[in-house]
A protein has these predicted regions:
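Short, flexible helix/strand-to-coil boundary loops that buttress conserved ligand/catalytic motifs
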Residues: 22, 156, 198, 225, ...
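P-loop NTPase nucleotide-binding core
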Residues: 31-143, 149-153, 158
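Alpha-helical sensor/transducer elements of the RecA-like P-loop NTPase core
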Residues: 46, 181-230
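Amphipathic alpha-helical "lid/sensor" segments that cap RecA-like P-loop NTPase cores
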Residues: 223-295
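Conserved catalytic network of the ASCE P-loop NTPase/AAA+ motor domain
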Residues: 26-28, 56-59, 134-138, 170-180, ...
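Regulatory alpha-helical "coupling" segment adjacent to P-loop NTPase cores
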Residues: 301-304
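Walker A/P-loop-proximal flanking segment of P-loop NTPase domains
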Residues: 1-39, 46-55
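Sensor-1/coupling segment of RecA-like P-loop NTPase cores
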Residues: 151-200, 213
Length: 304
């Protein structure tokens, strides 16, 4: 259950529009793969979790979410294979329990028989066959959502997994009278790296396009300001315009805005000085970000 004190800003219309696009139900068809790029910490992953995934589920799809940043030290291909295995386990919970109870781990459908623990493993069942099995067994479309997909490029196995997803997409969606059985969504906080999945004839998703994820705007800050001010004394409240200006200066990053507002809210000043402090703190944090970015840039090798 959601804490009533927790601020949530739903973006259901955006979620519906993007799901329409990846389903092929929009004039802006992106059924070949939806690639969303946005700077880190701008609300992209939160949007996936609270808006886009529920939209897929409301339409009856099985959602497989893989966050390649959740464990940077693990092989990206294994994270993807593990998520697919988990989805199959959930759909086959009863059957697997019976099979393993009698010492078996193989099962199949549509002419495909495999060992669950070998999905995506060299010499084991391919991701294509595993996803095909999941669709045939459940009769439900599949939404495969890869968050921070650019990390797949860090290894050859990760790149191969991207090609496997593309092959699965082609196998499931061809000759289906426009029925999209496998919907693929890829997000990334590094647009240039994400583009390496779509630009060039040798890339896994050649021909797909990168879409800029719409950043939060004044509607978000106005709603958040109202939510925050309800919990503050009348003579110690934030000005909506000042909050948006700070938010914009911070690169439209919700968590950074909350940090700055928290510092200001606990200051001893009243509304006028508090809003001035808000601008000062946001500007200082922005300078700090730029300084860190400049230091990181100078530390890179020329090829990087």
């Amino acid at each position: 259950m959601t804490d009533p004190k927790q601020f949530i800003f739903p973006r259901k219309k955006l979620a519906a529009d993007l799901v329409d696009a990846v389903c092929g139900a929009s004039p802006f068809d992106q059924s070949s793969g939806l690639f969303l790029a946005a700077p880190r910490r701008t609300g992209k992953s939160t949007f996936l979790r609270l808006d886009m995934i529920p939209e897929f589920e409301n339409r009856g799809a099985i959602v497989i979410l893989v966050d390649l940043w959740s464990d940077p030290d693990r092989e990206p291909a294994e994270l993807i294979a593990e998520a697919v295995r988990d989805a199959i386990r959930k759909s086959e919970a009863g059957i697997i329990k019976v099979l393993r109870g009698i010492g078996l781990s193989k099962f199949g459908a549509g002419g495909v028989s495999f060992e669950l623990d070998k999905v995506g493993v060299v010499g084991g069942i391919t991701l294509t066959d595993a996803l095909q099995y999941l669709y045939e067994k459940t009769g439900r479309s599949i939404a495969l959502v890869i968050d921070e997909a650019q990390h797949a490029l860090n290894s050859q196995a990760g790149i191969n997994a991207m090609f496997a997803i593309k092959a699965a997409r082609d196998a499931l969606n061809q000759n289906t009278a426009r029925e999209i059985r496998l919907m693929a969504v890829f997000t990334g906080s590094n647009r240039d790296k994400l583009s390496n999945l779509v630009l060039g004839r040798t890339t896994p998703f050649y021909g797909a396009m990168i879409t800029s994820f719409p950043l939060l705007d004044r509607k978000f800050t106005d709603a958040f300001t109202a939510h925050t001010n309800e919990r503050l004394a009348e003579d110690n409240r934030f000005d909506p315009a000042s909050v948006f200006a700070a938010f914009d200066a911070l690169g439209r990053r919700p968590e950074e805005l909350k940090k700055v507002l928290t510092v200001c809210a606990f200051s001893e000043g009243k509304a006028a000085s508090m809003n001035a402090l808000l601008a000062q703190n946001a500007a200082a944090l922005r300078v700090d970000y730029l300084s860190k970015f400049d230091g990181l840039f100078k530390s890179l090798d020329p090829l990087e």
